[in-house]
């Protein structure tokens, strides 16, 4: 679990491992935000460690999904803002230049845009189910769509009536603005 990792392993990481983990934390933060996956405190995710030939790879995986598409406060969907993740956030700001952080955010958005385009039918069905279910209170929906409208300037957020509409607007925004940002795009 992330909280155990922060307590036991984080203080002993080499600079190279800190950079690798910081890169993954930036990407995890963006994945949570784009998917409206909230409350990713350190005990709600795991750090998966994979030994490669000459280095260690890190992947952060969510294990608790009960706050997905529920909260109105946009910061709840960004693990970097949660106090339990302060050490990860601090480490990231120290070991990664701002330009690198911005690049990793763009890469994650481009990857999500390509995945969304590739799974259009399945995603459409999921969003339809989300729109038919009341996932959150209307005041939380209004708060979140207002915050995302202010952040992006995209009027599709203003038109959203529920969390399914908000997620659809977010995915549409990502696909329109980041689909071709991937260095691996064909």
Q: Could you describe each region identified by the protein language model?
A:
Residues 1, 14, 162-166:
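Alpha-helix capping and helix-coil boundary motifs
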Residues 1-7:
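ATP-binding pocket architecture of kinase catalytic cores
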Residues 8-74:
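Conserved kinase catalytic-core segment
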Residues 53-186:
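C-terminal catalytic region of ATP-dependent kinase domains
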